[in-house]
């Protein structure tokens, strides 16, 4: 039977480089010696013997003994006449002469919980219809593309009255409904929680027993393929949560798989997570590396997944994560960095980057570990994006404050930009922030009912304007009151309520504007993409800033489009070449609106009837969006000469309490003559405090290369 698991297969697996090992391990319907059946292979290096047990053989360990493949630790067998949708496990005889029964680590399908068996299935003959999506993804620059992620837990997004499946929605219906909802609202991607098989609903999918099996709660593996296909055809990307940090101790799972530590480290100081009561993968063992790396690639290859969001990265990087002194072992240099996990990430992410097909990988990393999103060649870990947990913490702390006291916490909203370019960040308001007595987003807001919604609108508007990609958890776009629970659907009935419907419409209009105007997203990771107009108006708790397109340009005195100050054409570069490369030179015709965007946000209920905002030179600014939503009619505000916010021009706008304003404008080349009309000043006490804060901010910027580590 060596023709199934060849010598080359064994070698590559042994050195951790068999990136399609899932084509060999697990259960594979096939024909052998003229007979149809299923081939099985499993790695159990400490086992005395392994047998295939199933419904077919009465779960008898003596019925289908497996053959050891030399000294590889691999066992294999072929069972004739076995087909799809049959339950099976591996019976493993340990060194203590005890039989233990395990689900297939490489199993493609699992029994519906509470059952724990693996299920045979054939993944080879699904017909995909997303070729156009996959081809377009290859050409897309993900850094310069819109990314507004809708985080979804399928088990509680919607429930059906299906008692056989405990009300779980089918993959196909979820795909259709999510595609319709995301396109209606303006989301670009869904991020799906809990897709890999897990026995306990309350783990939310973060204690995985079937890394290669889409959960059977919603259907079969091919049903999940169909869901991805539906979303891709609708233009929606699909990101999965992926959990290589730890796994549960369930008897049928990976823990002590062959009677001894197999996938985990044998030393509990390295192999067990004290806070979560779970096992930690042994990242230094090549076969374990291979299991995880091939698993990541499996989701990209077989399921056309667009991205993986890696959970709990910090717990993998630090040997002392969640441990007291004496409970952890330092690395060979005496430090607390997990060198094996670091190399694992570099190995994994270098492979994903080399695919060059638009596949992305995202880190949920909660510390200031440096260079998460730098390439491995540059000394980084190689992730494409990182969740910005620091921004989230500061944002929520500020938004919870009574507006009366927000002036004392003004810098919480501005601090994020001081390190915004240290990594390629995604701003997140995830499921973790609306559980465990943290309250939902709307319940975090201060004030009476109407004020809470006004606050949340202003906060979301600030978030969408801030540099970085974006993520929002389900239910928070219409102001769900209750905390999230995996056991029930989110409260869709709230869309019938006035304030909830108003917030929902507000978010829909804002998200569509986000996708329509490239200045929102195209230069998220470029210094030119964001500039404060006034970051220091703490006394009035007002923020104003500008977003530009990448390589934005200004209108010259002759009326021609000219390269922006940081984007002059190279001497050897022709105008036509500039256009083809999208560099922003003269005569440029790019997709989308060329305008820059001005954001103004009032975080108090105090109306400012004639609020001046500093501006670059421009003829006028078009009002696009307010606290009421998308502007219903075209309205332009003149940009006039007069110093304000350190700029030579300004516009004046009547800013309501909790008011917001979004303007589009085209920058023009400025004249050099002096201005004659100064910006209206605050009273002397406000001005003194503002000047002091400016100086502190200036000094802080001089000394803090990365403020989160200072």
What are these regions (language model features)?
Residues 304-306, 324-486, 494, 515-521, ...:
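Conserved alpha/beta catalytic core and glycan-binding cleft of carbohydrate-active enzymes
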Residues 551-593, 671-707:
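Intrinsically disordered, low-complexity terminal tails and inter-domain linkers enriched
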Residues 42, 90, 152, 192, ...:
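Conserved, mostly hydrophobic/aromatic
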Residues 84-86, 638-673:
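C-terminal beta-strand-rich structural cap/linker in extracellular carbohydrate-active enzymes
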